[in-house]
Amino acid sequence: MDKVQYLTRSAIRRASTIEMPQQARQNLQNLFINFCLILICLLLICIIVMLL
């Protein structure tokens, strides 16, 4: 278990030390925001359908 935690921690550290280009980070943020908006819309549609 400790080994798994250590591997996970080192992987996270390695991922955070890799400097992402600004454009890639921007694209990831846009993707994440779009994904969240789509999820919220789906939830709203489900709620409306249940209420009707």
Swiss-Prot record:
GO biological process: acrosome assembly; adenylate cyclase-activating adrenergic receptor signaling pathway involved in heart process; cardiac muscle tissue development; circadian sleep/wake cycle, sleep; intracellular calcium ion homeostasis; locomotor rhythm; muscle cell cellular homeostasis; negative regulation of ATP-dependent activity
Transmembrane segments annotated in the record for this chain: 32-52
PTM (free text): Phosphorylation by DMPK may stimulate sarcoplasmic reticulum calcium uptake in cardiomyocytes. Phosphorylation by PKA abolishes the inhibition of ATP2A2-mediated calcium uptake. Phosphorylated at Thr-17 by CaMK2, and in response to beta-adrenergic stimulation.
Domain of life of the native organism: Eukaryota
Membrane topology: Single-pass membrane protein
Modified residues (Phosphothreonine): 17
Principal location listed in the UniProt entry: endoplasmic reticulum
Entry keyword set: Acetylation, Endoplasmic reticulum, Lipoprotein, Membrane, Mitochondrion, Palmitate, Phosphoprotein, Sarcoplasmic reticulum, Transmembrane, Transmembrane helix
Post-translational modification N-acetylmethionine, affected residues: 1
Tissue-specific expression: Heart.
Complexes and interactors: Homopentamer. Can also form heterooligomers with other sarcoplasmic/endoplasmic reticulum calcium ATPase (SERCA) regulators ARLN, ERLN, SLN and STRIT1/DWORF. Monomer. Interacts with HAX1. Interacts as a monomer with ATP2A2; the interaction decreases ATP2A2 Ca(2+) affinity. Interacts with VMP1; VMP1 competes with PLN and SLN to prevent them from forming an inhibitory complex with ATP2A2. Interacts with S100A1 in a Ca(2+)-dependent manner.
PANTHER family: CARDIAC PHOSPHOLAMBAN (PTHR21194:SF1)
Name this polypeptide is given: Phospholamban
Organism this protein belongs to: Canis lupus familiaris
